[in-house]
From Swiss-Prot:
Residues at which ATP binds: 10-20
Domain of life: Bacteria
CDD domains, sorted: QueC-like
Task performed by this protein: Catalyzes the ATP-dependent conversion of 7-carboxy-7-deazaguanine (CDG) to 7-cyano-7-deazaguanine (preQ(0)).
The keyword Aminoacyl-tRNA synthetase is annotated on this UniProt entry: no
GO molecular function, one term: ATP binding
Full protein name: 7-cyano-7-deazaguanine synthase
Family: Belongs to the QueC family.
Cofactor: Zn(2+)
Pathway: Purine metabolism; 7-cyano-7-deazaguanine biosynthesis
Entry note: cofactor: Binds 1 zinc ion per subunit.
Disulfide bond positions: none
Catalytic activity, reaction form: 7-carboxy-7-deazaguanine + NH4(+) + ATP = 7-cyano-7-deazaguanine + ADP + phosphate + H2O + H(+)
Length: 220
């Protein structure tokens, strides 16, 4: 893969930034694509652009505002509360988001001569999003290959690891401090360690605390 090109689906968050560093390590050339779907915090797009610029990565922003029109949700509507009732999908779930994002990333990848697509989806997060499942990604990979007659490979470096292991991966890639200080995970739009209260911040902090304890224990 060292001689090939990849496109990373990139939001500027912890997971996708870790995947961006992973891709830089794996491929000869890397581009990033970010989707504007009228998300609650436009800062997400600015954050992604700043990270891509700092890393010298070509960055494309695609307008996906249609998604908000079709599937209103707590990630795009400030009048909707972020909730997660037991047995139900969180209010932050956006129907069709990863289906559309990966499909458009594939179209872009083919146009720029890349066959590798990297995304930070994983099954181990609390959310249970159906479009983060390995079976979905593998199914879509086959569909994209058939639809464009092109040998795409969708990579999911985080699929089977939890947040603590994601922090460990960023550390192994030499990007731990970068990811901690410059990424945006917080639903309230606070870069770095975030607000500490929203579900995304709580998940991120729990993983960070676990990893730091493990790292400290390993060094003793």
């Amino acid at each position: 893969m060292k001689k090939e090109k990849a496109v990373v689906v990139f939001s500027g968050g912890q997971d996708s930034t870790t995947c961006l560093f992973w891709a830089i390590e794996q491929f000869a050339e890397v581009e990033a694509v970010t989707f504007n779907y009228n998300q609650r915090h436009k800062l997400e797009i600015d954050c992604a652009a700043e990270i891509a610029k700092e890393l010298g990565i070509k960055h494309t922003v695609l307008d996906m505002s249609l998604l908000n029109q079709l599937a209103p949700n707590a990630l795009t509507r400030t009048d909707m509360e972020i909730t997660h009732e037991e047995g139900e999908l969180p209010s932050t779930f956006v129907d069709g988001r990863n289906l559309l994002f990966l499909s458009f990333a594939a179209v872009l990848a083919k146009q720029v001569g890349a066959r590798h697509i990297v995304t930070g989806v994983c099954e181990t997060d609390f959310s249970g999003y159906p479009d983060c499942r390995d079976v979905f990604v593998k199914s879509l990979n086959v569909t994209l290959n058939l639809s464009m007659d092109y040998p795409f490979v969708i990579h999911t470096p985080l699929m089977w690891i939890d947040k603590a292991e994601t922090w460990k991966l960023s550390d192994e890639l030499g990007a731990f401090e970068f990811v901690r200080e410059k990424t945006l995970t917080c639903y309230n739009g606070i870069i770095g360690d975030g607000c500490g209260e929203c579900p995304a911040c709580q998940l991120r902090k729990a993983g960070l605390d676990t990893y730091l304890q493990e790292r400290e224990g390993a060094s003793n």
